[in-house]
A protein has these predicted regions:
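A short, structured surface patch at a secondary-structure boundary
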Residues: 45, 64-126, 223-226
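Proline-aspartate-enriched helix->loop->beta-strand connector
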Residues: 62, 109-123, 139, 241-258
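Short secondary-structure boundary segments
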Residues: 69, 125-126, 146, 203, ...
Length: 319
């Protein structure tokens, strides 16, 4: 999980930490890492191989799941496992029926988590000794890290389906997402000219490249991501400089920090030198829901539609 659902500092730390976590898991019985689990795997026990080759065995269908990942929470409810969720973290605000608590996925408290007597814990990253601490208590922990592309997202949904006994429902959710995304992309006309986009994660200029699920959305819509050309130690969530962004002169600026950092067209225009950027001069600085834009679950189609709508408006103005 990267910097989406927290304060600015927490939103920054997660993308960097998540790079150390493997981008996908494999259902042990399926062999290859990219093999998709099947509904048949809903028979328990099931074994899932996670980061570093460690295997997580779930002996019985879980009925007291603790989710420390807002994205995983959305996935669990989407596949029909909501009734099995006993607690979710403080950032899991969707759906509203999720049993939200003070648990933190960024600073996990092993004792507090164990207090919910979970038979499965799902998180986006192993931070603060989470995996070691839960394993010491013989509590199964499944890490589902930030997706690098839509296929990763689909795979994680299927894995959660297998882990919770909702394999068929998960397959149905994924099929629906694939169909929606495919149909939408096919229906959207590509920009007549190469439009440059800058996606802002927070007001210290962390961004995303095409090596992320967010970046893939821009690529599918025919946009050129200015972060792809940045030379940074972080290939997927680089921190850009103000000078780099101004020089790149994006046609569209997407703010995924409207809620966390209170950014909008006015605050962006007030930044030194930013008034010369094409997107700022033309008013093409748009805010998107911080959560929808940063979670790789079933609502990703909403983010895609929002961006496409603004691109079409930009094209009409240029015509």
């Amino acid at each position: 999980m990267h910097k989406h659902q927290h304060t600015a500092s927490a939103k920054l730390a997660a993308p960097i930490r998540v790079m150390a976590v493997a981008s996908c898991f494999a259902i042990a019985s399926c062999g290859a890492a990219q093999s998709a689990p099947t509904p048949a795997a809903a028979h328990f026990p099931v074994s899932i191989t996670g980061p570093g080759g460690a295997t997580v065995t779930i002996a019985q269908k879980p009925h007291r799941i603790v989710s420390l990942s807002p994205t995983a929470t959305e996935m669990l409810f989407a596949i029909g496992a909501g009734a099995q969720v006993a607690a979710v973290d403080d950032q899991s605000n969707y759906p509203s029926s999720a049993p939200r608590t003070k648990l933190s996925g960024f600073q996990p408290n092993i004792e507090a988590i164990a207090g919910y007597s979970p038979d499965l814990v799902v998180a986006a990253e192993d931070t603060g000794g989470l995996v070691h601490g839960l394993q010491a208590l013989n509590l199964p922990i499944l890490i589902e890290p930030a997706a690098k592309n839509l296929d990763d997202s689909y795979l994680e949904i299927k894995q959660l389906g297998v882990a919770t006994g909702h394999g068929a429902e998960a397959e149905s959710v994924v099929a629906g997402m694939r169909s929606q995304v495919g149909a939408f992309v096919a229906s959207v006309s590509r920009p007549a000219r190469q439009l440059r986009v800058y996606h802002e994660l927070d007001n210290t200029y962390y961004s995303v490249t095409s090596a992320t699920f967010i970046g893939q959305v821009y690529k599918l819509l025919g946009l050129s991501n200015i972060a792809d050309s940045a030379t940074a130690a972080t290939p997927d969530y680089p921190q850009l400089s103000a000078e780099y962004i101004v020089a790149a002169n994006p046609d569209l600026i997407v703010l995924a920090d409207t809620r966390c950092c209170q950014q909008d067209l006015g605050t962006v225009a007030a930044r030194p030198g930013w008034g010369a950027i094409t997107a700022v001069k033309s008013g093409q600085v748009i805010g998107v829901d911080d959560d929808v834009a940063s979670r790789w679950g079933p609502r990703i189609i909403e983010f895609m539609r929002a961006i496409a709508a603004h691109v079409q408006q930009l094209e009409k103005k240029a015509a």
